[in-house]
Amino acid sequence: MKKVLLINWDCYPNFATGGVYTWTKTLIDSMTDYEFIVINELSNPNSNGVYTIPKNVTSVIEVPIFGATRYEEFCKRDNNLQARILKTTQHVIKEKFIPLYTEFMKSVLSDRCNTKILADVIIQLHDLLVQYDAKKCLEHPLTWDIFIELLNKEPIYSSMTFKEALTAFQLIQRNIQLFSIEVPKVDIIHCSLAWLPSLVAVYAKKESSCPLIITEHGVAFRELLLYYNAFLFDEPSKVFWKVFSHNIVRVVYSVADVITPVCEANKNWEESLGADPSKIKVIYNGVNTSRFKPMQVERESTRPTVVTVARVDVFKDIVCLIQAINYAKAKIPDIQCLIYGTSSDLDYSLRCLKTVKDLQLEDHVKFMGGTKEPEKVYNQADIIAISSITEGFPFTIIEAMACGKAVVASDVGGVREALDGCGLLVRSRRPHELAQGMVKLLQDENLRRQFEIAALKKVRDEFTLEKCVESFKKEYENLSNVQTAREKKTAEVLIQ
């Protein structure tokens, strides 16, 4: 049985929610002839540690980035920590670690980053940090001195505030801890994103001499740009993180053998960021049409009902959805919106609740929490509305389509590829337009029925679970065959 190293971030198996979790679980559950080893980088070490995994998941490596200063504090690695600490002398730090750290930082902050050099430095840092203590190296005063020295060489970075510089240093420091992880030898590496957690794949690919596949659901760099523009108010910090992020993404793309975005929109972004077009092949997400299908369910009310299934966070723009319901209420006074989804952003959740209260929509907008039966939730709705400001190829849309529901959604990411010809598209962050779409679908029964039939047919023709899984099986087989041919050729050369 071939082994696959699957690299995630705040996802399977600890976080049983969201589209990437659905995709990961589906992939693992459907490919029982492969053995999976899962690495999940955790932003919070107090994340859920109680979960059920299938037999073909033989190991889960949980890596905390915050809340633990050593990987060994969280997971038992071996009995040699004390020996590694003692080996990590001043000489080792100054003569071995600092030169590599300096080269790494120069590369990630360069507007002309050589991705081959950066990949080589990452591999060398890994080779060093598995032998010594990463904590002593990363927390040595010289490491901070080098970081500040490099910032001061660039006029724009030199004007970063102390707080912003320290935050940047600590975030990078925490993620370099990843390089100290020893990963088992595998036959294929599969990353569910192209971002910091995927740097593990750079050295794991070298150690296992195996192919690497990257599946981006939402293009990490695009979503990072949205975050930086929304939450970073210090201009030098914005530039710092945009340059840093671009170079991290580029080095991950550069070592990949295959990149499988979930939609053409993501493919366009990846090409614009420097990914080799010959490596890219779109594989759309697929939905289980045996589970998600039109069905009769009990409804609590006969009121015109709009449903959304989404996390309550800024990227789903639930505030826009609430505002749209307020506009739609003028045309359909008894309209109601049921929002199914959890939230990890307390401030944004409170903002949503305040918006409902300020607009006096308590009788029209209800937060239902998460659901384990989304197929029933979709079938309770008259229509589905999605207000996101960024998406990849969202499961919530194809699941709704599979349930034979008409959808109105913001035209972002791969949403158009799903809804074209069978739903309404509106511009993001336009509550007036979203409201108009809702009203149109709710009042025009013929149009709604037309979209319901077209959506159901399109999902069954193009976006089934079977089609998605079969595509990944073919990619795994192709990569394995190519790798076998390489090994055979290498062996023949050695024999000669």
Show which residues each predicted segment covers.
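Short alpha-helical donor nucleotide-sugar binding micro-motif in glycosyltransferases
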Residues: Y253, G370-T371, V377-A381
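Nucleotide-activated donor-binding/catalytic signature segment of Leloir-type glycosyltransferases, i.e.
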Residues: S349-T371
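Short hydrophobic beta-strand element within catalytic cores of glycosyltransferases
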Residues: A406-A409
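Carbohydrate-associated surface elements
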Residues: A265, G286
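Aromatic "clamp/platform" in nucleotide-sugar-dependent glycosyltransferases that forms part
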Residues: I389
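Conserved donor-binding/catalytic core segment of Leloir-type glycosyltransferases
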Residues: Q296-Y327, L338
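Glycosyltransferase donor-sugar binding loop
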Residues: Q336-L350
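Conserved acidic donor-binding segment of nucleotide-sugar-dependent glycosyltransferases
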Residues: L424-P431, K440-E445
